[in-house]
Amino acid sequence: MTIRTERVGNAIRKEVASMLTRGEIKDPRLGGFVNIQEVRVSPDLSYAKVYYTVFGESDQAGVADAWQRASGFLRNVIAKRLKLRHAPELRFELDHVADYSKRIDELLNGLEIPPADDSDETH
């Protein structure tokens, strides 16, 4: 990523997250249990992938649909607030990193590692 794409991605992430916090996105499926993790912007600034996580037992398909429906509104608001001549087209993807992390923790906690035997050590 170039400095510009990284800067635009961070600005979009902050703006979308603050819009969620302030309740500017009216869809109730996006309230409370959705977190913006990262935004990756294409080199030509025409597309931005917004990675989000959903906490709890929220309807993930419903959340994806809500993002899709709100994308035009968000693009318009982002263009105005960030003073971009052409705001990138927003694409939303569920970020599975939290799920992977949880699964790895479960696997590590399930390992039965025998205690270290101090009698084998040589001094």
Curated annotation (Swiss-Prot):
GO terms for biological process: maturation of SSU-rRNA. One of its GO terms (molecular function) is ribosomal small subunit binding. InterPro entries: KH_dom-like_a/b, RbfA, RbfA_dom_sf, Ribosome-bd_factorA_CS. It is found in: Cytoplasm. It comes from the Bacteria. Keywords: Cytoplasm, Ribosome biogenesis. The keyword Cytoplasm applies. Gene3D superfamilies: 3.30.300.20. The keyword Cytoplasm applies. Belongs to the RbfA family. Monomer. Binds 30S ribosomal subunits, but not 50S ribosomal subunits or 70S ribosomes. One of several proteins that assist in the late maturation steps of the functional core of the 30S ribosomal subunit. Associates with free 30S ribosomal subunits (but not with 30S subunits that are part of 70S ribosomes or polysomes). Required for efficient processing of 16S rRNA. May interact with the 5'-terminal helix region of 16S rRNA. This is Ribosome-binding factor A. It comes from Magnetococcus marinus (strain ATCC BAA-1437 / JCM 17883 / MC-1).
